Curated annotation (Swiss-Prot):
It is an enzyme of class 2 (transferase). SUPFAM superfamilies: UDP-Glycosyltransferase/glycogen phosphorylase. One of its GO terms (cellular component) is membrane. GO terms for biological process: lipid A biosynthetic process. It catalyses: a lipid X + a UDP-2-N,3-O-bis[(3R)-3-hydroxyacyl]-alpha-D-glucosamine = a lipid A disaccharide + UDP + H(+). Pathway: Bacterial outer membrane biogenesis; LPS lipid A biosynthesis. Residues 1-21 are annotated as: Disordered. This is Lipid-A-disaccharide synthase. Its EC number is 2.4.1.182. It comes from Gluconobacter oxydans (strain 621H). Condensation of UDP-2,3-diacylglucosamine and 2,3-diacylglucosamine-1-phosphate to form lipid A disaccharide, a precursor of lipid A, a phosphorylated glycolipid that anchors the lipopolysaccharide to the outer membrane of the cell. The gene is lpxB. InterPro entries: Glyco_trans_19. The keyword Lipid biosynthesis applies.
Amino acid sequence: MNSLPESGSDGQSSADPSQKATSLPRYGRVIWILAGEASGDVIGARLMQALHAQDPSLVFAGVGGGRMEALGLHSLFPMSDLAVMGLVEVVPRLRQLSQRLLEAVQDIELRKPDLVVTIDSPGFTLRLLQKIERSGIKRVHYVAPQVWAWRENRVKEFPGLWDRLLCLLPFEPDWFAQRGLEGRFVGHPVLQSGVRQGNAQRFRLRHNIPAHAPVVILMPGSRRSEAPRLLPVFRKMLDILRVQYPDICPVIPVAPVIAPTIRQLIRKWPIQPHIVTDIHDKHDAFAAAQCALTKSGTSTLELAMGNVPMAVTYRVNPVTATIARRLIKVPHVAMVNLLAGREVVPELLQENCTPKKLAETVSKLLSDPQMVEKQRMAFADVLDKLSPPVGTPADAAAAEIMDLLNEPVSRSSRS
């Protein structure tokens, strides 16, 4: 399937909804869907395909990235406008984010969709759900806010925001139930990533990498504020590592939308990393890799799916870090470690995110088979916990959405 129907599209992704007619033509039931970052775009694309398989007459509108647009979605505005991380980093973007929120609300009011799906990005999506609370439109939030990790008091704001909450992690429904909210586990989308289909030899041949050269994956993040903080540290780390590993080959998989930014940031590196934007090439890179260094988040599960030994690192604005440490309630930031209940992969955060410490950790991953094997054994246990009861995660999420969509409006329950 190359394309899906899109409601009332005129091919203009950034038009002002307030300047259009007061209604748009409808060709079937409309689902308005919003993703705010690269991982949400992947989830959204798979969800669109699964929904279309269950009801081919569905049409889609909203905001998404390249993968959702490849299925026919004409994004209301660039998804990259919403991708921002950090309590301090968001401040310069507040005016733009407020404008995008207004545009999204106006578009929903104009289209009057049968259902709205918001994916992750709670800083933006939960405000959007609140703005349309009185519209009578059914609402689904996909990827439960991680309030179990930090700022638990936010849970008091959730009643009434959605009709259905779809959870990726198996412990989340119980956590929300204890606080009077219903969540439904649909499995983790990483299980559908296709990582295990990668081919190591194909990657080395395509990029002219010698068979003996160690391949190290570097994942600095998909948000504008992440890479500029991590990449300078990665560069200095590589300067240290190339003394011991002169043929080390760094690979940076990134979403196409931020590839130009990454290329600009690394243009003067003495060791030029391979920039990978194609999803299949990324999977081949994982297959070829000896280890990885990644920011925290879903990427840790993706690497675990690829059986790639890793360390997790992160660096944010010092003020953001100070505030976050007071609010975070969990012992680990890496999803692999959280699900394992122990530190499976090293976490080198903030002041521990230094070139020397990163180089020492990567060197261990390249030279210590026991460390590698312990990680890989833990990966298998963690991934077993992420499967939905039946089918794929996208199918399970689509089934929940279709169930709500088919309910009479009067029966839709507000959590």
